[in-house]
């Protein structure tokens, strides 16, 4: 669909140039797109990877002619650092709307708690914001200028529960009957866990035997892992957001003889699959660990993954890179539809998008419902195999089959 749009608008531009219509033939000044994400502090790494995805997306769009409806105007990325606290994120959003009044749209802000704070500010400024954050609350506030490309935490939990049980049974393991939950208290994690406990565990025949919440950064994982050792659940739902917390928990599980598949471990979110996890945790320690994520570089993205590695040294393409890359194409489509670099027009255009399936997000369509959620947004299940987190579900994106750790 993007190719057809580019071809059509390219012909229109050529015709306009021949007819001497200066408004169509002359490119406008650059169109500024914001990326508001952590570039410093504890969460700097994910924010920097989001920047990589945005840069590649803008590079590709500009190389293919920019925004045809605006005379080939090029996109320009403006990066705003949220820092590493909710208060800093809110201040960054206030600074963004004050210092960059020409922004037509933005993407960000990584942690759901940051995105909740940022969008309180951007909503008042009528600035459309795309986000890969998970929390259900993001699109339950009646806001009109936030657009959630990821499946929400609750949706991911609903989709993943029967899928995980099927993966276990299809791999020849016994059907899980007991489950432990160890989670941090970030907004996305709490949203996922609430949905599990309220609506999903009992219908799936799962008994909750450990239910622990901690505040990052975690100082000592021993008390949490001791409860796992005492109960020996059939499955562990493991929801850290910070890599250092994941490291402490995995190390302690291995120390207590519970790691490397002895308790099948399922994480939600990408912290457990970040490349720099291997800087401090061995590949053997994470072998078999599964993660449910909203997006991942998968089958069909090989060329993009290769570019990311060549340009930035990234060994694989996490959600932060591919979703932010895709966001640039959403904003291009909206600008083409809007026909002007105006934030209100762009927001209206995003609400009206109906582009069918997207190559940059799993499941569903490039279309948003009245709350701002992407229609039919799916999920991706990845698993550490031989030192790399690879896609094992859905089948159309999988690069290998899942291996379910045996009890």
Q: What does each model-found stretch correspond to?
A:
Residues 21-27:
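Sec/Tat signal peptide C-region and signal peptidase I cleavage site
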Residues 1-11, 16-21:
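Twin-arginine (Tat) signal peptide motif
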Residues 2-8, 27-407:
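Extracytosolic ligand-binding ectodomains
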């Amino acid at each position: 669909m993007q190719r057809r749009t580019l071809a059509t608008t390219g012909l229109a531009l050529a015709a306009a140039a021949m007819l001497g219509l200066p408004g169509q033939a002359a490119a406008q000044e650059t169109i500024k797109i914001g990326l508001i994400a952590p570039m410093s502090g504890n969460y700097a790494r994910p924010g920097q990877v989001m920047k990589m995805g945005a840069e590649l997306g803008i590079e590709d769009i500009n190389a293919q002619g920019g925004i045809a409806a605006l005379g080939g105007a090029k996109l320009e990325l403006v990066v705003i650092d949220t820092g590493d606290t909710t208060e800093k994120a809110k201040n960054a959003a206030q600074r963004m709307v004050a210092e960059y009044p020409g922004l037509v749209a933005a993407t960000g802000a990584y942690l759901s708690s940051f995105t909740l704070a940022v969008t309180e500010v951007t909503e008042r400024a009528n600035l459309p914001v795309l986000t890969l954050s998970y929390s259900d609350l993001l699109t339950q506030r009646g806001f009109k200028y936030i657009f959630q490309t990821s499946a929400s935490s609750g949706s991911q939990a609903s989709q993943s529960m029967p899928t995980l049980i099927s993966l276990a049974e299809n791999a020849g393991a016994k059907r899980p009957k007991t489950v432990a939950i160890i989670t941090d208290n970030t907004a996305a994690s709490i949203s996922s866990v609430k949905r599990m406990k309220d609506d999903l565990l009992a219908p799936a025949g799962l008994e909750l035997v450990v239910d622990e919440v901690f505040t990052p950064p975690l100082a000592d994982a021993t008390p949490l892992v001791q409860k796992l050792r005492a109960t020996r659940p059939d499955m562990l739902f493991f929801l850290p957001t910070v890599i250092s917390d994941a490291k402490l928990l995995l190390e302690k599980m291995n120390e207590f003889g519970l790691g490397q598949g002895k308790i099948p471990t399922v994480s939600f979110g990408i912290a457990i699959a970040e490349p720099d996890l291997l800087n401090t945790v061995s590949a053997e320690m994470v072998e078999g660990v599964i993660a449910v994520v909203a997006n991942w570089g998968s089958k069909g993205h090989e060329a993009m993954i290769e570019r990311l590695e060549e340009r930035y040294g990234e060994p694989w393409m996490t959600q932060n890179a591919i979703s932010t890359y895709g966001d640039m194409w959403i904003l291009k489509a909206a600008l083409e539809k809007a026909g002007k670099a105006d934030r209100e027009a762009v927001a209206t255009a995003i609400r009206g998008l109906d582009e069918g399936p997207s190559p940059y997000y799993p499941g569903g369509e490039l279309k948003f419902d009245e709350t701002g959620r992407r229609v039919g947004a799916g999920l991706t299940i990845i698993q550490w195999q031989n030192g790399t987190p690879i896609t094992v579900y859905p089948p159309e994106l999988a690069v290998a089959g899942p291996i379910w750790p045996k009890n």
